[in-house]
């Protein structure tokens, strides 16, 4: 099946999911013949399967549904297809294009009696005998095979009625012959109950965790269906599976699907329900559950929220919990060989479970059901939207690419939110008081891409609910100047997210950290926001001082939590503002509570280096005191790119002014270039302040003139008819001139000198401006940051004073 070029590891891990190609596997196609008991195949296929016209066959569909039908030949049908009508498809729970298997079923007996009941909403208002009008003509002389649980549709006397086969004798299938007794007494079956069984969860309803599903299938289905396999190879089949992962990824759903698809007896234990106030009763509840499952083997016991009943024994204070853990251990590993009982458990805190439970023989397989990637999210969206009416413009792939860090539950919420938005748009046509809603309105409802966009703006991933992560609304246009810095940043964050293949090609892991330093008010924070917005990554902003708390050890725990969250919501930009407050040089902090700041730094250092390379997590630090930051954080591999953000030069100042006044009406004669020339040494924040003040003055003038006008109107009503134009249509020169009177510089020359010096020393200790390889052709080598690695002796000759041990 798989080509030899495939890497073998991937192949085998999901081998169980592959459909085996067998001649009796056929693709479902729409029927021409509308009969409920007939399926048609092509003649060559019938010969291959050794079937004859009129044979009874057994069809197997999804979720272990079966149906018995009569097979006919149809020359228009292609070899690999099978034609069946809607009724048979519903009984098999399949759609057009799905694959079913067919096998001959020669030993179907004639039925002695069958019991059928109508479904209530199809018989409303029908008086008279159902049997005479519907059932008798349907079964007369037809010799139809039926199976218990089937639903069939009978047309007759103006309308169609659906019946369900409740009981057959002999069970489970038989042929209705002329002497079969047909009962149809009893209450009609409610449509709701029927729908519920239709909506059982199967493997198709789970998206985004193929590998995990394969693992679970081989753990559960192989021992239950073919225990001989394990006997032949001489090992005991595995007993326990522990599913863990963040909330909302579908752990309980997988267990339900496994139960429905395998047909094993399914016993659900909710963790907290076991507990009882009487001594010894909690343990006996557990024992009962296991006994019940053993009676009904093969069985699956599913323990939801395992951490509630099996916490670590040394941590718990209650005696009951300890006894329950011990009881669970002995049950899972009892002396008597447990017959075909598989225990599955789900939790989202695998590390708070008693370690004795996690050894081989108890919960020996731990399946991590993680946050899905883009293809997984697309699968999940397709599952959730398969019953939705989507407009043509909906692009689910795009939605999947934009929902970073969302789990299945978040995507389900997203779909329902989009659907609600579609309904809200039609709200003016819907009257709540009416009994029914107009059919036209119902048919015109469809979910458009705009609804999805709106829902996207509302939803954020549940893993990040408490640290509110929002993609900021700042774009590159909002930032004037700094072109080189922008390019550098794009390379840092956007390339690894958008072109990971290039990094693979050149064999490099992308760098993960940047430190902005420079005088206050030059747009360091703004840059970090813009980069998060541009590449649609999640953005967590951490204010330095918030991490420090008064409790011993809590500050470090905060750091750990933040990094964990970022990993879950990757791609993610972690932005440490005011880095100098938490990453001061270690050792000098006298009077600091028990050295908390030092421990926080150590934690940050280990987190930055222990970042798993798979995840796209970027760290951006910003500070205006680079001289007091611990040097260990500045080494390559942590914050390896140090970017100095200087005060803007004249060109940048023009750009900043333009960016600030993008949305404001400015008079034509305001000369921004001249303004930029005059404001030498001003930071970006100072320029923004000038613009704000000019706007404020214009607003003040406009409001005052309106008040004046109002007064005039009251004194002279006849002047009202004349429409006057806006008194202050734009920001004029005099507003800027007035604003310039209050303008001030926030960064003194002295400070600037300090930053320049720091940047200078960094450049010197890091780069080799004049470095060339000793060959004939002069390779292009500019001053490269942080590339002083492979140049052995040069380090000591150029700047000896910088070396500690020189």
UniProtKB/Swiss-Prot annotation:
Source organism phylogeny: Eukaryota, Metazoa, Chordata, Craniata, Vertebrata
Cross-link Glycyl lysine isopeptide (Lys-Gly) (interchain with G-Cter in SUMO2) - where?
8, 18
What is its subcellular localisation? Answer: Cytoplasm, Cytosol; Endoplasmic reticulum; Nucleus; Cytoplasm, Stress granule
Recorded protein name is: Transitional endoplasmic reticulum ATPase
List Phosphotyrosine occurrences by residue.
Answer: 805
Q: Which reaction does it catalyse?
A: ATP + H2O = ADP + phosphate + H(+)
Q: What is known of its domains?
A: The PIM (PUB-interaction motif) motif mediates interaction with the PUB domain of RNF31.
Gene3D superfamilies in UniProt = 1.10.8.60, 2.40.40.20, 3.10.330.10, 6.10.20.150, P-loop containing nucleotide triphosphate hydrolases (3.40.50.300)
Segment Disordered: which positions?
Answer: 708-727, 768-806
Modified sites of kind N6,N6,N6-trimethyllysine: 315
Q: Where is the composition biased (Gly residues)?
A: 777-793
Modified residue N6-succinyllysine is at which positions? 668
Native species: Bos taurus
Modification sites for Phosphothreonine: 436
Described purpose of this protein according to its UniProt entry: Necessary for the fragmentation of Golgi stacks during mitosis and for their reassembly after mitosis. Involved in the formation of the transitional endoplasmic reticulum (tER). The transfer of membranes from the endoplasmic reticulum to the Golgi apparatus occurs via 50-70 nm transition vesicles which derive from part-rough, part-smooth transitional elements of the endoplasmic reticulum (tER). Vesicle budding from the tER is an ATP-dependent process.
Q: PTMs?
A: ISGylated.
């Amino acid at each position: 099946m798989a080509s030899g070029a495939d890497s073998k590891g991937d192949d085998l891990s999901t081998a169980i999911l592959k459909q085996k190609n067998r001649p009796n596997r056929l693709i479902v196609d729409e029927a021409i013949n509308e009969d409920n008991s007939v399926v048609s195949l092509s003649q060559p296929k019938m010969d291959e399967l050794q079937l004859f016209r009129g044979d009874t066959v057994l069809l197997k569909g999804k979720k272990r549904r079966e149906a018995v039908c009569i097979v006919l030949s149809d020359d228009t049908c292609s070899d690999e297809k099978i034609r069946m009508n809607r009724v048979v498809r519903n009984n098999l729970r399949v759609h057009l294009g799905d694959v079913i298997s067919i096998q001959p079923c020669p030993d179907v007996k004639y039925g002695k009696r069958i019991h059928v009941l109508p479904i209530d909403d199809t018989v409303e208002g029908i008086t008279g005998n159902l049997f005479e009008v519907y059932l008798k003509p349907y079964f007369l002389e037809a010799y139809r095979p039926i199976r218990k649980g089937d639903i069939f549709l009978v047309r007759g006397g103006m309308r169609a009625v659906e019946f369900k086969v409740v009981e057959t004798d002999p069970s489970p299938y038989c042929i209705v012959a002329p002497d079969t007794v047909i009962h149809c007494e009893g209450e009609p079956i409610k449509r709701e109950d029927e729908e519920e069984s239709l909506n059982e969860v199967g493997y198709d309803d789970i998206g985004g965790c193929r590998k995990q599903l394969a693992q679970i299938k081989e753990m559960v289905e192989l021992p239950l269906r073919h225990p001989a396999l394990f006997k032949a190879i001489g090992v005991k089949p595995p007993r326990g599976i522990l599913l863990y992962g963040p909330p909302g990824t579908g752990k309980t759903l997988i267990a339900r699907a496994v139960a429905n698809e395998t047909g094993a007896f399914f016993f659900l234990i909710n963790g907290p329900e076991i507990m009882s106030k009487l001594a010894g009763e909690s343990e006996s509840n557990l024992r009962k559950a296991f006994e019940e499952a053993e009676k009904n083997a093969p069985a699956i016991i599913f323990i939801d929220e395992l951490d509630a009943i099996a916490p670590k024994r040394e941590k718990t204070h209650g005696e009951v919990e300890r006894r329950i853990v011990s009881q669970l251990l002995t049950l899972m590993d009892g002396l008597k060989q447990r017959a075909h009982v598989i225990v599955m458990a789900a939790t989202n805190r695998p590390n708070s479970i008693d370690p004795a439970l996690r050894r081989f023989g108890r919960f020996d397989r731990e399946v991590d059901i993680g946050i899905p990637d883009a293809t997984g999210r697309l699968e999940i969206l397709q599952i959730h939207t398969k019953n939705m009416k989507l407009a043509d413009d909906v692009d689910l792939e795009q939605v999947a690419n934009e929902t970073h860090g969302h789990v299945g539950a978040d995507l389900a919420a997203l779909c329902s939110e989009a659907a609600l938005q579609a309904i809200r748009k039609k709200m003016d046509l819907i009257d709540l008081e009416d009994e029914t809603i107009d059919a036209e309105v119902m048919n015109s409802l469809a979910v458009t891409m705009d609804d999805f966009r709106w829902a996207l703006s509302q939803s954020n991933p549940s893993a990040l609910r408490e640290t509110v992560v929002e993609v900021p609304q700042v774009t590159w246009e909002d930032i004037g100047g700094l072109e080189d810095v922008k390019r550098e940043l794009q390379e840092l964050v956007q390339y690894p997210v958008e072109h990971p293949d290039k990094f693979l090609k050149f064999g490099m892991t992308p760098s993960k950290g940047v430190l902005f330093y420079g005088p206050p008010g030059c747009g360091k924070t703004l840059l970090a926001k813009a980069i998060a917005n541009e590449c649609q990554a999640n953005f967590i902003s951490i204010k330095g001082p918030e991490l420090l708390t008064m409790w011993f050890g809590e500050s470090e725990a905060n750091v750990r939590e933040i990094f964990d969250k970022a990993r879950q919501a990757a791609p993610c930009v972690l932005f440490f503002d005011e880095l100098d407050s938490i990453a001061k040089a270690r050792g000098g902090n006298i009077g600091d509570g028990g050295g908390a700041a030092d421990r926080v730094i150590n934690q940050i250092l280990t987190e930055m280096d222990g970042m798993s390379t798979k995840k796209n997590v970027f760290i951006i630090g910003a500070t205006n005191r680079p001289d007091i930051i611990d040097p260990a954080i500045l080494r390559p591999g942590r914050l390896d790119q140090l970017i100095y953000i200087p005060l803007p030069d004249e060109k940048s100042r023009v750009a900043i002014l333009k960016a600030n006044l993008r949305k404001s009406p400015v008079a034509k004669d305001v000369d921004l270039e001249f303004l930029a020339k005059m404001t030498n040494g001003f930071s970006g924040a100072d320029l923004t302040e000038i613009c704000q003040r000019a706007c404020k003055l214009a607003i003040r003038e406009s409001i005052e003139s309106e008040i004046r006008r109002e007064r005039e109107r009251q004194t002279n009503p006849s002047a009202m008819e004349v429409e006057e134009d806006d008194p202050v249509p734009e920001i004029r020169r005099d507003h800027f001139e007035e604003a310039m009177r209050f303008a001030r510089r926030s960064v003194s020359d002295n400070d600037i000198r300090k930053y320049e010096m720091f940047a200078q020393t960094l450049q010197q200790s890091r780069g080799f401006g004049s470095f060339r390889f000793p060959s004939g052709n002069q390779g292009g080598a500019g001053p490269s940051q942080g590339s002083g690695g492979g140049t052995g002796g040069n380090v000591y000759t150029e700047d000896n004073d910088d070396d500690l041990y020189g």
